[in-house]
Swiss-Prot record:
Expressed in leukocytes and pinealocytes. Expression in the pineal gland does not undergo circadian variations. Keywords: Cell membrane, Disulfide bond, IgE-binding protein, Immunity, Innate immunity, Membrane, Phosphoprotein, Receptor, Signal, Transmembrane, Transmembrane helix. It comes from Rattus norvegicus. The modification Phosphothreonine is found at residue 78. InterPro entries: CD3_zeta/IgE_Fc_rcpt_gamma, FCER1G, Phos_immunorcpt_sig_ITAM. The modification Phosphotyrosine is found at residues 65, 76. Residues 45-86 are cytoplasmic. Coiled coil: none annotated. It is found in: Cell membrane. IgE Fc receptor is a tetramer of an alpha chain, a beta chain, and two disulfide linked gamma chains. Associates with FCGR1A to form a functional receptor complex. The signaling subunit of immunoglobulin gamma (IgG) Fc receptor complex. As a homodimer or a heterodimer of CD247 and FCER1G, associates with the ligand binding subunit FCGR3A to form a functional receptor complex. Associates with CLEC6A. Interacts with CLEC4E. Interacts (via ITAM domain) with SYK (via SH2 domains); activates SYK, enabling integrin-mediated activation of neutrophils and macrophages. This is High affinity immunoglobulin epsilon receptor subunit gamma. GO terms for cellular component: cell surface; external side of plasma membrane; Fc-epsilon receptor I complex; Fc-gamma receptor III complex; plasma membrane. It is a single-pass type I membrane protein.
Length: 86
């Protein structure tokens, strides 16, 4: 709401009419360009924070399984068949 009021007041000022069309367009393009850069930086910062939080939560969940190890034993063991003594 406030930016709209400021823009409206700037358009009412006599000096703003002296700019002409191309200069006003360049100013608006520069504002839009800076706005895009700021939004891109904020988006990248948010993605990095989410990724760090995800990695931290995975490390916490991996702590549950630290005591569990697979056995060094094959699934199928060979039977040791001994001949009965005669």
């Amino acid at each position: 709401m406030i930016p709209a009021v400021i823009l409206f007041l700037l358009l009412l000022v006599e000096e703003a009419a002296a700019l002409g069309e191309p200069q006003l367009c360049y100013i608006l393009d520069a504002i839009l360009f800076l706005y895009g850069i700021v939004l891109t930086l904020l988006y990248c910062r948010l993605k990095i924070q989410v990724r760090k939080a995800d990695i931290a939560s995975r490390e916490k969940s991996d702590a549950v399984y630290t005591g569990l190890n697979t056995r060094n034993q094959e699934t199928y063991e060979t039977l040791k068949h001994e001949k009965p003594p005669q």
